[in-house]
Swiss-Prot record:
Catalytic activity: uridine + ATP = UMP + ADP + H(+); cytidine + ATP = CMP + ADP + H(+)
CDD domains associated with the record: UMPK
Protein name: Uridine kinase
GO biological process, one term: UMP salvage
SUPFAM superfamilies, sorted: P-loop containing nucleoside triphosphate hydrolases (SSF52540)
Pathway it works in: Pyrimidine metabolism; CTP biosynthesis via salvage pathway; CTP from cytidine: step 1/3; Pyrimidine metabolism; UMP biosynthesis via salvage pathway; UMP from uridine: step 1/1
Enzyme Commission number(s) from the entry: 2.7.1.48
Length: 208
């Protein structure tokens, strides 16, 4: 195991391909100690609120996340200690009662729409990536994902996109692009960018 694990931040708009880029990196190092942690796992617990109140949550605002807890757990992993990561239930709009045990790794990919927005998170990262994808492509992907995986209606998705997702993208997410070491146009289909990133990771891991 490396003396100090490396942390890679991957961000971009909702439906922009962040997870696909992260998984492409994971798949490129099948024999390495590497894991992905999603900022979405750290949405705040809302079990004390009524369901009607929960569904009004602005999930694209920094205050929706318990980023303090994420930072605490990342520091634990950097220190070589395992953590129990929360699991979020999107259908109930609150945290599940179960957690996921994550052991320390050599490479930790931190993925989420706002992971470059918080300076404290940025300070933990060795490589910062911004996946830059066309707005139309992102909304189409979001519709497919939320309908298939999260049981939402088309009307609710479009309403949320126009009233919350798009404004929050321009207020918080897009401005964080300036902190990225590498901007990846079109996400995982940009093979050259993925190869450059993988080469950098491989050099750190001593696999080249």
């Amino acid at each position: 195991m490396l003396k100090k694990p490396i942390i890679i931040g991957v961000t971009g708009g909702s439906g922009g391909g962040k997870t696909s880029v992260s998984r492409a990196i994971l798949d490129s190092f099948p024999n390495a100690r590497i894991a992905m942690i999603q900022h979405d796992s750290y949405y705040k617990d809302q079990s004390h609120m009524s369901f009607e109140e929960r569904v009004k949550t602005n999930y694209d605002h920094p205050l929706a996340f318990d980023t303090d807890f994420m930072i605490q757990q990342l520091k634990e992993l950097l220190a070589g200690r395992p953590v129990d990561i929360p699991i979020y239930d999107y259908k109930k709009h609150t945290r599940s009662n179960t957690t996921f045990r994550q052991d320390p790794q050599d490479v930790i990919i931190v993925e989420g729409i706002l992971v470059l927005e918080d300076e404290r998170l940025r300070d933990l990262m060795d490589i910062k990536l911004f996946v830059d994808t066309d707005d139309d492509i992102r909304i189409i992907r979001r519709i497919k994902r939320d309908m298939m995986e999260r049981g939402r209606s088309l009307e609710s998705i479009i309403d949320q996109y126009t009233s919350v997702v798009k404004p929050m993208y321009h207020q918080f997410i897009e401005p964080s692009k300036r902190y990225a070491d590498i901007v990846i146009p079109e996400g995982v289909s940009n093979v050259v960018a993925i190869d450059v990133i993988n080469s950098k990771i491989a050099s750190i891991l001593g696999e080249v």
